[in-house]
Amino acid sequence: MADQNYIHAKDAYNTLCTALDNIGWKYKRMDDELKIMFGVNGDDLAMNFLIIVDADRQLVRLLSLLPFKMDENKRVEGAIATCVVNYLLADGSFDYDLEEGNILFRLTSSFRESLLSQELFHYMVSVSCHTIDKYNDQFLALNNGDITITEFIEKNS
């Protein structure tokens, strides 16, 4: 079964690479690990992505760590803001590390007993870029004291 899972994962990985090639994106392949890294310039902050094809769990995970940490005195507000945003999202979520202040965007799709299309990968990348670009500057503004948690909530209600 493990060999079959790896073959299925390798197919998903190759489809993902083809999808990125077809939209003309530059990326770094890590074929042995079934991982891809790439970056995108957003409206305000750069976004770095790691896509992992997990053969054992039959998942594709798209991850993007925001390029700043919430300051220690803003961590509780960061947790509240993350909950507010996650409530609004249909696909993907922001994971928040209260201890470290890190915010990580994650979008996952299963390929167990199914095939993932190039269109799905385009969607995953597109929705991730849009979502991160929409909220990363708001999280940063909250961290920098440019907006209050009340203003953050009002803007996203």
Q: Which residue stretches match the model-derived regions?
A:
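Short, highly charged C-terminal tails/helix-capping segments
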Residues: 140-157
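Ser/Thr-rich, low-complexity intrinsically disordered terminal regions
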Residues: 23-47, 53-60, 67
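Amphipathic alpha-helical segments
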Residues: 6-27
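Short, internal acidic amphipathic alpha-helical interface segments
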Residues: 65-102
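A generic structural motif
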Residues: 66-70, 109-116
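Beta-strand/loop substructures that line and gate deep hydrophobic ligand-binding cavities in soluble
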Residues: 95, 101-114
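Long, contiguous binding/interaction regions
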Residues: 115, 122-133, 141
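Short, surface-exposed coil-to-beta transition loops
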Residues: 45-48, 89-91
